[in-house]
Curated annotation (Swiss-Prot):
Cytoplasmic side of membrane: 327-382
Pfam families from the UniProt entry: EGF, EGF_DL_JAG, hEGF
Bilayer disposition of the protein: Single-pass type I membrane protein
Any Gene Ontology CC annotation: membrane
Lineage of source species: Eukaryota, Metazoa, Chordata, Craniata, Vertebrata
Protein name: Protein delta homolog 2
Molecular-function GO terms, alphabetical: calcium ion binding; identical protein binding; Notch binding
Extracellular compartment spans: 27-305
Gene: Dlk2
Record keywords: Calcium, Disulfide bond, EGF-like domain, Glycoprotein, Membrane, Repeat, Signal, Transmembrane, Transmembrane helix
Keyword Chaperone: no
Location within or outside the cell: Membrane
Keyword Repeat: yes
Length: 382
């Protein structure tokens, strides 16, 4: 029993690792535990050292992954007969027990669990599983990383499985990613491999050039003017008395004498420079004076008065023409302004009745000629 251990009813109450052994007694708890590879636990079981296992800590732990082997010391993998390899996973009789070569291939054992297959003409692969089909016969024609597929060589024809961004029978065509015109606002689309990029014009940004840059962000307007953003430009709404692109100019106050009076454009008057200045290199310069020529409105009809006159004359002419037309229409229908004989009241009778109207051009009360007596049954009206 190791020193430092206290045994009670075959239970080791305390065991210090590395303690030396003493002669065992019959009642020691070490009678059922390999004390060279472990010690007794408080529950009466053996507590094994690292690399050992078992009920009595009598068995070493093999290397992880060891399949057909054993060990004499921890972490070993000693292969059983017929097996080889680091993990004892190679069958030394694989050529006879498993026949790994297909399609008539011959298996050759290389030792250490390794083998190779001698394939018949037209087949290839580690196990001669692949036939020299259309892909191999065509020299693997798929381009741009495309994968040639022919069902392990047993298909009649090959097909190319293209990577993203390519198309065609041999994956030889680069798909135009700019075909759908993804770039906005007149941007230039640059095609890539399964991607595109937009070259934005000035004033725009973003992947698709859809973001209008704020030209007012730098606050270019002065005098407290309000800035209005445009496409790659801006406008300043200047307060009264200021002008210019950024309201940097102070406008002169208007002359009260010229307010409301149409003015002609200002004219530049060139006046030769005069004075007693000594002659120098700049003596030949001209003095330019800008004077504003104001022309007052001459007497006569203005534009608005002329328009009103034309409209009034047109309405008057239309009214006169309508009166003449109505008068002519009434005259053609035989309507007399005076006299009942020209417009008799409607009379309904079972028989026909003729009536003749005689109009005299003589003054009222003038007797008719005796030679023209009225006809019987006729009515004479003066």
């Amino acid at each position: 029993m190791p020193s430092g251990c206290r045994c009670l009813n075959l239970v080791c109450l305390l065991c210090i690792l590395g303690a030396t052994s003493q002669p065992a007694r019959a009642d020691d708890c070490s009678s059922h535990c390999d004390l060279a590879h472990g010690c007794c636990a408080p529950d009466g079981s053996c507590r094994c050292d690292p690399g050992w296992e078992g009920l009595h800590c009598e068995r070493c732990v093999r290397m992880p992954g060891c399949q057909h082997g054993t060990c004499h010391q921890p972490w070993q993998c000693i292969c059983h007969s017929g097996w080889a390899g680091k993990f004892c996973d190679k069958d030394e009789h694989i050529c006879t027990s498993q026949s790994p070569c297909q399609n008539g291939g011959q298996c050759v054992y290389d030792g250490g669990g390794e083998y190779h297959c001698v394939c018949l003409p037209g087949f290839r692969g580690r196990g001669c599983e692949r036939k020299a089909g259309p892909c191999e016969q065509a020299g693997f024609p798929c381009q741009n990383g495309g994968q040639c597929q022919d069902n392990q060589g047993f298909a009649l024809n090959f097909t190319c499985r293209c990577l993203a961004g390519f198309m065609g029978a041999h994956c030889e065509v680069n798909v135009d990613d700019c075909l759908m015109r993804p770039c906005a606002n007149g941007a230039t689309c640059i095609d890539g491999i399964n991607r595109f990029s937009c070259l934005c014009p000035e004033g725009f940004a973003g992947r698709f050039c859809t973001i209008n840059l704020d030209d007012c962000a730098s606050r270019p307007c002065q005098r407290g003017a309000r800035c209005r953003d445009r496409v790659h430009d801006f406008d300043c709404l200047c307060p009264s008395g200021y002008g210019g692109k950024t309201c940097e100019l102070v406008l002169p106050a208007p002359d009260p004498a010229t307010i409301g009076t149409p003015q002609a454009p200002a004219s530049a008057v060139v006046v030769p420079a005069t004075g007693s200045a000594p002659h120098s290199a700049g003596a030949g310069l001209l003095r330019i004076s800008v004077k504003e020529v104001v022309r007052r409105q001459e007497a006569g009809l203005g534009e608005s008065s002329l328009v009103a006159l034309v409209v009034f004359g047109s309405l008057t002419a239309a009214l006169v023409l309508a009166t003449v037309l109505l008068t002519l229409r009434a005259w053609r229908r035989g309507i007399c302004p005076t006299g009942p004989c020209c417009d008799p009241a409607p009379h309904y009778a079972p028989a026909r009745q003729d009536q003749e109207c005689q109009v005299s051009m003589l003054p009222a009360g003038f007797p008719l000629s005796p030679d023209l007596p009225p006809e019987p049954g006729k009515t004479t009206a003066l």
